[in-house]
């Protein structure tokens, strides 16, 4: 369905202006320059859509600029994806040979890691299916297969959900019988390693904090059943993935959770853009809008869709429904300042204690409360209630995800 041109109501324009004042890009030393941000976005658009980038974005870039672009792409986990755009750039606009070689080597390493991830995923799915179980692969490789260069989509862990009643418990029993011992988390999920790849079993397929919205959406999987698809990427595996409308909802709420917390990165934005581009003809836009309305995230979608069209070049007609798009600047600030799950944030320390991590997560969410109230007030309310109750590790609050 053709989307309307970007427009914002007066009320939300005022709200956006307040968010912009609170989230100034100039307050963090980690933010790349405007020229570097523009160049990286041009590389991503080129890699995503298979077209030449705008050459003027790369004219005049210094060696230091290219180094900043490379490091930012690393932190945003889009380094290998951005590398795919160099085939469209003339030699005189490419980075210097030393950096280009480093970029190429690390891209090859990322692609090799993706191959290992695919082998592990294929093996794990076979382990479960031979026992009569049907794991659904959430995010990650279920989306990587949609990319023009699937192996260039940098991966982290395997996320699974068992939607058939009783199968989640059966899966844990099967793993224990095989000598694998999943570790429980406070939100009801389980973590373990399979062929040196971290795996997480999720009790729910959404990241919604509101219990009322979760109840209203409990029948979503039955209305939109998961489907079997070819994993591809050099494998012969078949995997179960969410139906495209469900996948879209999962991604939108997942990005929202992290945008309200430590931060979100360009890779998750690219995932959503690729999903819409590849499967827009199969997405039930009317049903998707109704589900998002029930979850009270239509305003959030307006901001998110604005980012996809304004920053990643997604065509308006590939949005799931005609949308009132907001200026994406507030979301851009969250992406550029904090990066992929907050990896750019100077106060985030990987080795911090569990208690300290929870406190920092709470502080981070409180820092961005105005952002949440502007675009997803219901989710922000229930997130705040959980914080007040001290449940820092619930499904909606837990932000120490692996890199998916």
Question: What do the predicted segments below correspond to?
Answer:
Residues 2, 7-16, 20-156, 162-404:
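Conserved NTP-donor binding/palm subdomain of two-metal-ion nucleotidyltransferases/polymerases, i.e.
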């Amino acid at each position: 369905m053709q989307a309307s041109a970007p427009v914002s109501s007066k009320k939300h324009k005022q709200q956006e202006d307040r968010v912009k004042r609170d989230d100034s890009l100039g307050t963090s030393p980690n933010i790349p320059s405007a020229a570097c941000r523009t160049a990286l976005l041009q590389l991503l658009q080129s890699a995503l859509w298979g077209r030449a980038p705008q050459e003027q974005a790369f004219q005049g870039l210094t060696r230091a600029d290219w180094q900043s672009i490379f490091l930012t792409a690393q932190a945003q986990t889009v380094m290998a994806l951005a590398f795919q755009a160099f085939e469209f750039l003339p030699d005189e606009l490419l980075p210097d040979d030393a950096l280009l070689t480093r970029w190429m080597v690390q891209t090859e390493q990322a692609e090799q890691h993706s191959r290992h991830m695919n082998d592990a995923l294929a093996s794990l799915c076979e382990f479960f299916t031979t026992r009569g179980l049907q794991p659904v692969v959430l995010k990650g490789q279920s989306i990587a297969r949609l990319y023009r260069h699937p192996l260039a989509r940098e991966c982290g862990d395997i996320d699974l959900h068992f939607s058939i009643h009783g199968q989640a418990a059966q899966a844990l029993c099967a793993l224990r019988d095989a000598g694998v011992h999943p570790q429980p988390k406070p939100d009801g999920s389980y973590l373990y390693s399979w062929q040196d790849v971290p795996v997480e079993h999720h009790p729910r397929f959404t990241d919604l904090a509101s219990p009322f919205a979760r109840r209203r959406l409990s029948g979503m999987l039955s209305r939109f059943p998961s489907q079997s698809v070819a994993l591809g990427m050099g494998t012969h595996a078949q995997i179960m993935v969410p139906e495209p409308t469900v996948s879209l909802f999962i991604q939108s709420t997942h990005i929202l959770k992290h945008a309200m917390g430590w931060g979100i990165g360009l890779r998750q934005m690219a995932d959503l853009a690729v999903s819409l581009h590849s499967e827009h003809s199969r997405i039930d836009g009317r049903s998707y809008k109704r589900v998002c309305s029930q979850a009270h995230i239509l305003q959030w979608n307006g901001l998110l869709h604005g980012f996809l069209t304004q920053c990643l070049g997604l065509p308006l007609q590939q949005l799931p429904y005609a949308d009132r798009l907001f200026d994406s600047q507030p979301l851009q600030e969250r992406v550029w300042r904090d990066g992929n799950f907050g990896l750019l944030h100077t106060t985030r320390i990987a080795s911090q204690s569990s208690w300290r991590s929870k406190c920092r997560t709470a502080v981070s969410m409180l820092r961005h409360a105005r952002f949440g109230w502007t675009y997803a007030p219901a989710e922000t309310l229930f997130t705040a209630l959980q914080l007040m109750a001290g449940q820092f590790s619930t499904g909606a609050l837990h932000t120490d995800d692996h890199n998916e």
